[in-house]
Every structure is written in structure tokens, then in C-alpha cells.
Amino acid sequence: MNCVQVKDKKQIKRFKNFRRTLYKNDPFYVSTVEFTVDMLLDKTTKFAKSCITRPIMVEENQQVLAQCVLVKNPYDDFVQMAFFEGLERQEQAVALLKEQAKVFAKEMGVRRIIVGLNGHLSYGVGLSLDMEKPNTFDSTYTKTYYPQYFTDGKEHKLMAFRNTIEVFRSKLVQRPSKFTVRTVDFENFSKDMELFKQVCDETIGTTFLYAPTQDKHFEELIGEMKFFLRKENILFAFDGNEAVGFLFWHPDYNEILKKGKQNSLLSIALRYTLFKKKIKTVKVNSIGVKEKYQGRVTIQLLNEMMKYINSYDYAETNFVWENNRKSMAINRHIGGHIERNFAVYEYEI
């Protein structure tokens, strides 16, 4: 058994194939995260090019047992064991990955290792603690035995909430407001994505594990989704000329995608074109409001979203950290019950 660094094209292909084989025919897995894996490994975005990445795998008798991508984001004070995957009962193989992560951390001059973060919070976070249901678009999905490999680390829990649109709407109080809300301007998409970056960094920049974003970060990330988006999917709130909040929501595209199979951008676009009316869930991908406006503007943004989702039956949030009391309170009130549980693991070296 040995741990090897993935360097050439043949090894990278093997790395990607291990993941695909692992989830093949899994009835709860929708293969959308592969696009993020490809982005980091192939260095196709400004963000990916800014990161130091080192994919590694443990193999024995020409069989891959476990793998991950070691990542150092220049804005983080830790390294990541991102996109961890492995077979069951492979404690020794995972231990070898951890040792290499420690070596990598020392090379990068940091003393923390995070397991369960995939490059940046905007690309996905969390190992699944329970997942007997298909993953939603922009949420992670992993084998539920993975957390057992990291119980020696500090656990940070996060969860997603779900409720019916009817109940969700009933929890929102509508009040007169001096604030204005507008949709994204696709004619000035680059400019609005920089506004999105600015407001996002200013509002959720203190969230655990969040790293400041670089220029073009959201233009590259959300730009790939433009075919699937309508202008009302991204909302900005203003106090006069000052942007004070944002909300990004979208249909759960995964509901109409094939499970346990490889999905290409073309196949996703085709199925969306043919079956988009069958989607019954919307995802509240992210919402951020400057502190002094929280409450009033938060509710106004959610009420604005409600104008566009009458044809859906359910709403589900993205992740919420368990120790974020404000976010947990509003999600419990509006979001209903906890639908999914995830965890991230932290190591000090």
C-alpha cells in the first residue's frame, strides 16, 4: 500500500474514474460536483489557477483505495483535504492521506487541515452524515461512512432545512419598506457579478471557512449557470444607492437529472429544457444582508423571491452552520425541519 501524487494525464483520468465508479448506480447520487473537481484539477478558472493543488491517491495491487485533492487557497490559513473519496474499511489508506496532508500543511506554512471543504464554500462543503435521498443541486453528497474516518478530528456540523412553499410563505410577515429590490441585469452581468462578490464578502465574509473571493469568482461560477437562470434568481436589496443584501435562489435542477450516472453539461441542458416544469423544489442557495439591516431586508428579499415560486411545492435551504445562532433561528422558523446533515473535520498539527 502506498500513497502517490497524481501528476500526468493518465493518473488524472484514473483519479476521476475512481470517483465515477464509486457512485455508479447509486440511487441517491446526482453527478454535478464533478464539474468542480474538473475545474480544480484542470485549472480552468482564475480561482483554480490561484490555488496550489496536489491530488493524491492510495493504491494497493493496482487498485485505488482512497484519494483526495490537497488544496491551499491563498486566502486560507489552512489546507484542505478536498473531494475525499474512499472504499469502506480503509482506515490505513486514509491514515496515509492524513500524513500527506500534514506534510503539505507544513510546506504551506499553516497548522490546520480541513476535511470536507471543496476549494471554497461557494463550491460545496460537508461530508454527508445521512443521505438516504438524492442530493440537491449545489449541495455535496458523499458516502455516509466517510465521517467514521475522521472522528479523531474536531467536528463542525451543518445542515439544510426544508419546508412546503405554503408554510414557508405563511412565516413571512410583509411590512412597508423604504428599501428597494431589483433583479440581476444580464446585460451588465460582469458588473453585477462584481456587485454580488462585494455584497457577499461584506455580508457572509465572517462565516466559518469563508475565504474572500477574487475578481471574476462569481462571474465564472454563476456564468456557467446562465442558461438555467432567469433574472429573478439573483436579487439585490438597496438602501438608496447602497447595496445592503442579496439572495440567490434557483430550481433544484437535480430533481430531473439521472441518478448514479454521469451527467454532461449538454445532457443537463437537454433535460432541463424538456422537463423543467417537473421540478417541484427551489433552493435558497445563499442569502446575505449587512448586519444593521438583518431581519427587515432578509424578510423583504424572501418575500420578493416568493413572487416567482408559485409553481413549486417545496423550498430547501443551503447549508447552515450549527453554531450560527442567527441563521439557525431564522431557518428553524421559516425553513421547517432539518432535511440533511453534514460535517466538516478540523485537525491542528
Outline where the language-model segments fall:
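Conserved donor-binding loop and adjoining core beta-sheet/short helix segment
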Residues: T32-T136, F238-I256, G260, F275-V282, ...
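Conserved active-site tyrosine of GNAT-family acetyltransferases
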Residues: F15, F150, I330-N331
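Short amphipathic alpha-helix that is part of the acyltransferase structural core
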Residues: M1-T44, D77, R175-H217, E242-G245
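Conserved catalytic-core motifs of GNAT/GCN5-like acyltransferases
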Residues: G116, P134-Q148, K154-T164, H337-E348
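C-terminal amphipathic "assembly/sorting" segment characterized by alternating charged
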Residues: I299-I349
